């Protein structure tokens, strides 16, 4: 089933995007920061969410990992 129609998969994809964008911004800030509008601006926004809500995103990733490993 597509990740767009399965809520659990959609949350996994969003969390992975947030974590990936925040990590890439820490390695290559100019790559993410030069595009703040349009479609590429979505990745800048995801990186900002990952930086500002870092403890909450980390907790959500741990909970998601637990559910993927032991619950599904």
Curated annotation (Swiss-Prot):
A GO BP entry: intracellular transport
Keywords: Endoplasmic reticulum, Glycoprotein, Golgi apparatus, Membrane, Signal, Transmembrane, Transmembrane helix
Cytoplasmic side: 72
Domain of life: Eukaryota
Keyword Transmembrane: yes
GO cellular component, one term: endoplasmic reticulum membrane
Compartment list: Golgi apparatus membrane; Endoplasmic reticulum membrane
Glycosylation sites: 35
Membrane-crossing residue ranges in chain numbering: 54-71
Signal peptide: 1-26
Ranges of the Extracellular topological domain: 27-53
Recorded topology in the membrane: Single-pass type I membrane protein
InterPro entries, A to Z: KISH_domain (IPR051523), Ksh1 (IPR009653)
Matching Pfam families: DUF1242
Function as written in the Swiss-Prot or TrEMBL entry: Involved in the early part of the secretory pathway.
Stated family: Belongs to the KISH family.
Additional comment: Kish means 'small' in Hungarian.
Protein name: Protein kish
